[in-house]
Curated annotation (Swiss-Prot):
Coiled-coil residue spans: none
SMART domains documented for this protein: ZnF_C2H2
Gly residues: bias regions: 582-604
Source organism of this protein record: Drosophila melanogaster
One BP annotation, GO: R7 cell differentiation
Identification of the protein by name: Protein glass
Length: 604
C-alpha cells in the first residue's frame, strides 16, 4: 500500500506540473521520496534565476538538506560572475530527485532521473564511438530500485536546447531505432541583438507558437528572440578539432516548451549590437517503451557544437569568445529495445559589419547612368543630328538594299565616289557584329567612325576637297588624289593577272572579281548579282525609277552619268572641253558627267 500511495502521489505531482503553465512556458516541479519539495531543475525551467528572471512557478520551501540554493536567496536575479562552481554543482543543492519530463511522442508522460552536473574542464569527442565523461557518478539501477521497488527505471531523452550552456563537458551519441512514435521540431532563432560581455545579465524574452498535432506526429515551430546573449569565460571545453571552446560553465541548460498561448514579441532593441540569424532543424524519434539498461555499458556523453562570432565585427565586445552549445546526456544510455534518433542541423549567419544606416544611398544618376566603356571608339559614333549613340544597329548586307530607300538617298552618289567607296562598302556592308557604325540613310555599315563620317558627306553634299586644276570638289581626299592622277596619267595600281593598271586601289579590288567570278552584291528585287556596289547602285535605280542626272539643255533625266554623257554628244557639244554647256545634275555643280553627288566619271 505504501508503494501504491507513493506512486499515486507521484502521478498527481506530474499532473499538477503539467497544469502549471504561464506565458507559453512549462513549470516543472520535483519531489523526493520523503515528500519534501526541492528546487526545480535549472536545465528544464525556462524562467531560470541564473538568466536574470525569477521563477514564477508555484514553489514551496526547500528541503532540509539544502545548503543554500537560489530559492532560499529569494527571487532576485544574481549575476553570473558572482556564482561559484558550487552553484552549478547539483550535488550541493539538488538532492537526487525524480525529474518530471513530458514526452512528445504520443503524449505519454515519462519519468527520468536527473544526473548531477559536472564542473571543471572537460574534453569532447565528436567521433562515432564518443568520448568518456569525466564524471560517472550517476544514480544506478539499484538506487532507483530501492527508491521505487515496483517501478522499472524509465528514462526520457532530453530535448537538445538551442543555446544552453551546460556544465557537462563530454559528448554523447544516440543509437538509431525504429521510427514509431516520431516527433519533428523546427526551431528558428533570431537573437537580433547579441551583447557579449563577461559581467552582464541575460534578460531574454521569448514566445512560442504551437502548430499542429496529427496522429502520433507533432510539428512544433518555436521562435525564440533574445535581446542579449550573455557569454562569460567561466570554463574551457576543448573539442576534438583542437580549438578551445567558449564558456561551458557560465550558465545551466535552458529549455522552453511550446504551449497554446504565445507571449507577445519583444520590442525591437537598438541596432548598435551585431545580430545573428540561427536556423535550427531537429528530427526526433522517441519511444515510451524503454527497458532496463545498464548505466555502465555505454559512457555518458554530451554533444557539443561551436559557433564563433565574425572577426570583422565593429563591436569591441563581439570578439570576446566563441559559443559552445552543449546538450544534456542520457541518464541511462543503455541499449534500449526502442531507442531515440536525433538529427540536428544549424545554420548560423553573421551579419555584415556595416548597418543599414551606414550604407550610402544610391542616387538617380548612379542607377540610371552606367559607366562609359573604356574604349570609346568601339561605341557607335554618329555626327550631330545624324544618329543616336545609344542605338546599336544590326548588320545589313549590301544585298538587302531596298529600291524605295535608295530612291530617297542615292541621288547624292556619283559614279566616281561609288567606285571609290567599293572598298569601304566591302568593309562595312559585308562586316559582322564588330561594325556598329550604320548609315541611317542608306543602311551601309562601316568599321570605323571616321569612314562613316566621310560617307555621310555623300548625303549632305559637303565637298571640302577641291582640284587645283579643274576646280572640281570631292568629299574624300582619296577621290581627289585619284582625280589628280587623271591629269597626270599616273596609274600605280596593277592587276597581277592581266597587268591592267588603275588609278585607285579599290578599282583593282573590283577588277579582281572579274577574274574570280565573285559577285557578292545581289539585287533584292530581281536577284541579279554584281561584283561591285556601284554597279548594284546603278541597277537599283532601274527598279526605283530614280534619275538623278539631268540635261541642262533639254531637261532630260538619266539614271547614270554615262547615259547623260552620250546624250550630250547628241547636242553636238564637246563634253571633254569644258563644262559650260555640259549637263548639270540636281546638285547644281557644273562638271562633265557629274551627278548630284559631284565628281567626275572615270571611264577606263
Amino acid at each position: 500500500m505504501g508503494l501504491l500511495y507513493k506512486g499515486s502521489k507521484l502521478l498527481n505531482t506530474i499532473l499538477d506540473s503539467l497544469e502549471d503553465q504561464e506565458g507559453g512556458a512549462m513549470y516543472i516541479s520535483c519531489d523526493v521520496s520523503n515528500g519534501g519539495p526541492v528546487e526545480p531543475e535549472t536545465g528544464y525551467v525556462p524562467n531560470n534565476p541564473l538568466f536574470g528572471l525569477a521563477l514564477d512557478s508555484p514553489q514551496q520551501e526547500c528541503a532540509a538538506s539544502c545548503v543554500g540554493c537560489l530559492s532560499c536567496q529569494g527571487s532576485t536575479a544574481l549575476p553570473i560572475s558572482s556564482l561559484t562552481s558550487s552553484d552549478f554543482d547539483c550535488g550541493g543543492c539538488f538532492d537526487p530527485t525524480i525529474g518530471v519530463g513530458v514526452g512528445i511522442g504520443g503524449g505519454h508522460i515519462q519519468i527520468s532521473t536527473t544526473p548531477p552536473a559536472s564542473s571543471g574542464n572537460g574534453s569532447s569527442n565528436n567521433g562515432a564511438g564518443g568520448g568518456s565523461s569525466g564524471n560517472h557518478g550517476y544514480w544506478s539501477t539499484d538506487e532507483m530500485a530501492s527508491t521505487f521497488p515496483g517501478l522499472p527505471p524509465l528514462d526520457i531523452d532530453p530535448l537538445p536546447s538551442l543555446f544552453p550552456f551546460s556544465p557537462c563537458g563530454a559528448s554523447y551519441n544516440f543509437a538509431a531505432g525504429n521510427p514509431h512514435q516520431a516527433a519533428s521540431l523546427s526551431y528558428t532563432v533570431h537573437p537580433h541583438q547579441m551583447l557579449i560581455s563577461p559581467n552582464s545579465h541575460n534578460h531574454g524574452q521569448m514566445h512560442s507558437q504551437h502548430q499542429q498535432h496529427q496522429h502520433q506526429q507533432s510539428q512544433v515551430q518555436a521562435s525564440h528572440v533574445g535581446n542579449s546573449l550573455l557569454q562569460s569565460s567561466g570554463g574551457n571545453n576543448i573539442g576534438s578539432n583542437g580549438s578551445a571552446g567558449g564558456v561551458a560553465n557560465a550558465a545551466s541548460c535552458y529549455y522552453e516548451t511550446s504551449a497554446g498561448t504565445a507571449a507577445p514579441p519583444p520590442p525591437p532593441a537598438a541596432a548598435m549590437y551585431p545580430s545573428m540569424s540561427v536556423n535550427v532543424s531537429m528530427n526526433m524519434t522517441m519511444h515510451h517503451g524503454y527497458g532496463a539498461g545498464d548505466a555502465g555499458g555505454v559512457p555518458m556523453q554530451c554533444s557539443q557544437m561551436n559557433w564563433t562570432p565574425p572577426s570583422n565585427s565593429t563591436s569591441a565586445a563581439a570578439a570576446a569568445a566563441a559559443v559552445n552549445v552543449l546538450y544534456p546526456p542520457l541518464l541511462s544510455p543503455g541499449h534500449y529495445p526502442a531507442s531515440a534518433t536525433y538529427s540536428f542541423t544549424a545554420d548560423f549567419r553573421a551579419p555584415a559589419p556595416t548597418g543599414l544606416g551606414a550604407l550610402p544611398p544610391l542616387t538617380v544618376g548612379e542607377k540610371e547612368s552606367p559607366s562609359p566603356p573604356a574604349n570609346s571608339s568601339l561605341a557607335g559614333y554618329y555626327p550631330t543630328g545624324v544618329g543616336n549613340q545609344g542605338y546599336t544597329p544590326p548588320h545589313k548586307s549590301p544585298t538587302s538594299y531596298q529600291a524605295a530607300a535608295l530612291g530617297l538617298s542615292l541621288s547624292a552618289f556619283e559614279d566616281e565616289e561609288d567606285s571609290n567607296e567599293d572598298l569601304d562598302g566591302d568593309e562595312g556592308s559585308s562586316g559582322g557584329e564588330m561594325k556598329p557604325n550604320l548609315c541611317r540613310l542608306c543602311g551601309k555599315t562601316y568599321a570605323r567612325p571616321s569612314t562613316l563620317k566621310t560617307h555621310l558627306r555623300t548625303h549632305s553634299g559637303e565637298r571640302p576637297y577641291r582640284c587645283p586644276d579643274c576646280n572640281k570638289s570631292f568629299s574624300q581626299a582619296a577621290n581627289l588624289t585619284a582625280h589628280v592622277r587623271t591629269h597626270t596619267g599616273q596609274k600605280p595600281f596593277r592587276c597581277p593577272i592581266c597587268d591592267r593598271r588603275f588609278s585607285q586601289s579599290s578599282s583593282v579590288t573590283t577588277h579582281m572579281r572579274t577574274h574570280s567570278g565573285e559577285r557578292p552584291y545581289r539585287c533584292s528585287s530581281c536577284k541579279k548579282s554584281f561584283s561591285d556596289s556601284s554597279t548594284l547602285t546603278k541597277h537599283l535605280r532601274i527598279h526605283s525609277g530614280e534619275k538623278p542626272y539631268q540635261c541642262k539643255l533639254c531637261l532630260l533625266r538619266f539614271s547614270q552619268s554615262g547615259n547623260l554623257n552620250r546624250h550630250m554628244r547628241v547636242h553636238g557639244n564637246n563634253n571633254s572641253s569644258n563644262g559650260s554647256n555640259g549637263a548639270t545634275g540636281v546638285g547644281g555643280e557644273s562638271s562633265t558627267g557629274s551627278g548630284v553627288g559631284g565628281g567626275n566619271s572615270l571611264l577606263t
